[in-house]
Amino acid sequence: MTLPGPEAPGLSEALALIADVPDFPQPGILFKDITPLLAEHAALEAVVAALAAPGRDQTGAPVVDKVLGMESRGFILGAPVALALGVGFVPVRKAGKLPRATYAVSYALEYGEATLEVHQDALEPGDRVLLVDDVLATGGTARATIDLVEKCGASVHAVAILMELGFLPGREALGTVPLTTLLTV
């Protein structure tokens, strides 16, 4: 069986829909806008299939129990990946956004600190999860999410990212966790 992955048919066309927006949100920044990709059904389907691939074995069966998406664009991509895999979706939110008891992990930002949270009952001990997000930059959010999953007694099977900023050290922050990126810029 051929599984969709980073070389899946239609994926290169889908990734070509990502628009460059110069000087946004500030001068000197080249923003990568994924909204044109999201607006095209076939493109979104190709990206979801490729992001789901690390959550499957060679027969196509899911090898994860949950998909976690990091706030906020990880929600947009993670929920359909969970549907494609036939597993549940768990949102990882910024501090104070979840209404029930949570686990929390704080991590350093360039100028300060941020905290991520997940509901305490969102993962079971022993669950294997696939982390999904739109961008891997410094790796702080992904690393904090890995730590949060481990705090729940679960493990991260793999990380699936739409775009990796290759000029930043995000990959190194993941340690030995397998990483799939669909586009490196």
Swiss-Prot record:
Pathway recorded for this protein: Purine metabolism; AMP biosynthesis via salvage pathway; AMP from adenine: step 1/1
EC number, as in UniProt: 2.4.2.7
Subcellular location: Cytoplasm
Keyword Cytoplasm listed: yes
UniProt KW keywords: Cytoplasm, Glycosyltransferase, Purine salvage, Transferase
InterPro entries: Ade_phspho_trans (IPR005764), PRibTrfase_dom (IPR000836), PRTase-like (IPR029057), UPRTase/APRTase (IPR050054)
Catalysed conversion reaction: AMP + diphosphate = 5-phospho-alpha-D-ribose 1-diphosphate + adenine
GO biological process, one term: AMP salvage
One Gene Ontology term of the molecular function aspect: AMP binding
Signal peptide: none
Gene Ontology terms: cellular component: cytoplasm
Main location: cytoplasm
Subunit structure: Homodimer.
Function: Catalyzes a salvage reaction resulting in the formation of AMP, that is energically less costly than de novo synthesis.
Family affiliation: Belongs to the purine/pyrimidine phosphoribosyltransferase family.
The name this protein goes by in its record: Adenine phosphoribosyltransferase
